[in-house]
Amino acid sequence: MTAAREAIRMRAFDAFKADLEAVPPITLRGGDALDSYDEPPPYDAAIDEPTDRYLETFAFNGLNFLDAASWRHYLPRLIDYALRHIASNAPGTMAIDGLLWSLRPPDRDPPRLASLTREQEEAVVAALEQLAFSDDSVYRTDAMQVMEEWWIPGALYRPPC
């Protein structure tokens, strides 16, 4: 990982520190269960350890079903994963596609995108810039679209402040 990406990774973990320390009300595994019309299982520290394999298994389907607090809990881990796998579009990396889709409008009610602090938003933008503008990124087109829709000044679908 480049020094710039490592700095963004650390910035994300710092910005989301409180969210990382909290137990998520809905896990990615729980979100995946909801996607299959099942009841979400309770959090289990051993099963829900956010390893690469866990993210690859549950993020793509599970992210859509997370409330704001649960979503923020996983964002820094997904940013870390995306920066480490920026040049890969292997099947397991659909976790990155899930991350990008979760950063797109429209926002929810209650909001997820608008629930971020300024520091958290800056960490997300820094990660998106890496995904959008790095020569080795296979996510450039999608990341640029996500940025245009919500994350840049004058974004297409972000309500004015």
Where are these predicted regions, by residue range?
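Long, low-complexity, highly charged intrinsically disordered regions
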Residues: 1-62
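Extended alpha-helical scaffolding segments
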Residues: 66, 71-161
